[in-house]
Amino acid sequence: MSMARRDFIKQTAAAAAATVAGVPLTGYTQNIVTESEAAKLKWSKAPCRFCGTGCGVNVAVKDNQVVATHGDFNAEVNKGLNCVKGYFLSKIMYGSDRLTQPLLRIKDGKYAKDGEFAPVSWDQAFDVMAEQFKRVLKDKGPEAVGMFGSGQWTVWEGYAALKLMKAGFRTNNLDPNARHCMASAAVGFMRTFGADEPMGCYDDIENADAFVLWGSNMAEMHPILWTRVTDRRLSAPATKVAVLSTFEHRSYELADLTLTFEPQSDLAILNYIANHIIRTKRVNRDFVDKHTVFREGNADIGYGLRPEHPLQQAARNAGDAGGSKPITFDDFARFVSKYDLEYTAKLSGVPKNRLEELAELYADPKVRVTSFWTMGFNQHTRGVWCNNMVYNIHLLTGKISTPGNSPFSLTGQPSACGTAREVGTFSHRLPADLVVTNPEHRRHAEEIWKLPDGTIPSKVGAHAVLQNRMLKDGKINAYWVMVNNNMQAAANLMNEGLPGYRNPENFIVVSDAYPTVTTLSADLILPAAMWVEKEGAYGNAERRTQFWHQLVDAPGQARSDLWQLVEFSKRFKVEEVWPADLLAKKPEYRGKTLYDVLFANGKVNQFPNTELDPEYANQEAQAFGFYLQKGLFEEYAEFGRGHGHDLAPFDVYHKARGLRWPVVDGKETLWRYREGSDPYVKPGTGFQFYGNPDGKAVIFALPYEPPPEAPDKEYPFWLSTGRVLEHWHSGSMTRRVPELYKAFPEAVCFMHPDDAQALGVRRGVEVEVVSRRGKMRTRVETRGRDKPPRGLVFVPWFDAGQLINKVTLDATDPISFQTDFKKCAVKIVKV
């Protein structure tokens, strides 16, 4: 089969997307504007607002409103293409129920937890908010304050939040919603390579001979990257595509090899491949001997449940989940030898010939393999292990850090990499892979921030799941949520999420652009600017940092998260939040506000507004009197320059279509850790995994372990949750786009037809999905894109009217603390 690239682009990017979504694209797909009236539009560049692919778009503005967008032909990521969500970017900011003023729960003229929402001014909102935060800080200390942020924060918004929480309020109770999606990937990188984020880039796609998808439906979740994979598959017929999943989905349509496996058995399959490589003598011994070491990880590590849970009580190594010990290659070979073809086929349910064919793709030294994975790996009670184990395979064969040979973790949010991971908005991190538990790292941050020694606390803060538990238990009492919808996204939300938000002891603030399940659970709602209503920067999955200008004003009184964070800092005198002994080390800070110390510190405020581009507005710069974004970025960039995370100067990014770090002497890095590509690799070494002190990557011996909950007689089905092409995350933006809403208006329960028949239900019939934790009502779907095997159901989570996370289990990976949304036990009950 052959297809011209032009035809491929037309059919894949437009027709296929439209067919899947059921959306007429007439008027939205035309990239060349010829109408005279339309030609008066002002066009500017920006990265897409949705997933972590980082597509470039051109944005048209007229009369202070975004009126059109199209794929940016000059963007290397997408080369002019858009997915169906990208086609409708111009509509995401203009839902009729946009939040435009602060709303506070009021009763009898004053704030009350049981009050009704009423409009207030920003001053009133911040007065009440500051009063509540100061009360908690005084009564309980900084550990009773928390913030839940986002992989959708811009780089400088995340950096400002990091400074406010970890240096200002002196608490590490800051975590992003990327904990739900990328924590296992980040910890996997750190354990194997000593440094976070992929070594490869999207150029691997055009150089690979085989693609293996592990728990990733790229056709719907990363459709533009999927068009590039499809292009490679069709233009190079020898290229193979293998897809592994617990149920059949759209990505199966391109696959040469499909493997539908029993949930959790991917662990065994990964070990089988390693065993096959060793047994057939295809180990790249020269690479392995020079560039790797072997360790055996602790097993029986529990499931991240509450400490009193029986499974946690029974786990032998729950207190040292990330521990490991050194072993030899021979020890590793013996360890994986158990995972032979017979055992793995029986455990996984995958036919032997398919397992062998998959293993051969990795084992064949002539085949360049790129592995892609997303939530199927990461949202897993052994997600860190999955990440480590796929690296094992690439390291054993030396298929890493060269064009086409790449283990590639894909991200789901536009700046889960650039903000959550690189900036370090996790409860244990600081910028550029630094961590709060390392005293040298803390001192380095304090020096850059011009703070006294001991400002940053050494104790790891509460991660996302623990934050909900602490809110419920009354241990966190002042809490700020920004750019996420956790009361729709959190597992076991009715038992472990909502009770904490409505706990009478707690004051909950939610900043968002639209009403959501989470805003309705709050005490104070702050209206947020979104996307091109502010100047921003995102970092995508291939380490590409991209900037955009503010193109339009936010409606009403909506303000950016950056403005909210920085303005709120003015409400606190240093004496109100720091102990006397700390302040004594910097007596010149006495009487100053956190704003003075953190943001008007002589570094962040060093760039005057005369450096602004006169073509564009910048509300934050006008509000504070200096180029705030540039000051924050340049201070943040100090952490990474010279340390393998080099960023280019601020002004460069507004001209470029993004650059992949490390950027050294103006040159971006495509493949890390390889001599000749990565400037940090010493000449003569070939490869150098310099994140680890010895320059070597770690190959981990890790076992198969069962999930915490599996189907039984009472709850006979596996439940998996996830996304669909038309909607993004909780749907708070995409469900307000009429075309996307109509294409997929509500969630359904995808089920095998034979299971439906056995239950006496038909397509479209209402059922309840019931677990040990809760239940929700939806309709049965036995046809369409997702085709579960018997015994498994799939329910998307985008629908605020059908909260599937009432049902899910709040078990996490005990190392990364990322939730497993992909497997728990349920029963289906006809209504």
Swiss-Prot record:
Organism: Bordetella parapertussis (strain 12822 / ATCC BAA-587 / NCTC 13253)
Catalyzed chemical reaction(s): 2 Fe(II)-[cytochrome] + nitrate + 2 H(+) = 2 Fe(III)-[cytochrome] + nitrite + H2O
Gene3D superfamilies linked: 2.40.40.20, 3.30.200.210, 3.40.50.740, Dimethylsulfoxide Reductase, domain 2
Post-translational modification: Predicted to be exported by the Tat system. The position of the signal peptide cleavage has not been experimentally proven.
Keyword 4Fe-4S carried by entry: yes
Superkingdom classification of source: Bacteria
Name of this chain's protein: Periplasmic nitrate reductase
Keywords associated with the record: 4Fe-4S, Electron transport, Iron, Iron-sulfur, Metal-binding, Molybdenum, Nitrate assimilation, Oxidoreductase, Periplasm, Signal, Transport
Keyword Isomerase carried by entry: no
Domain 4Fe-4S Mo/W bis-MGD-type: 41-97
Cofactors: [4Fe-4S] cluster; Mo-bis(molybdopterin guanine dinucleotide)
Localisation: Periplasm
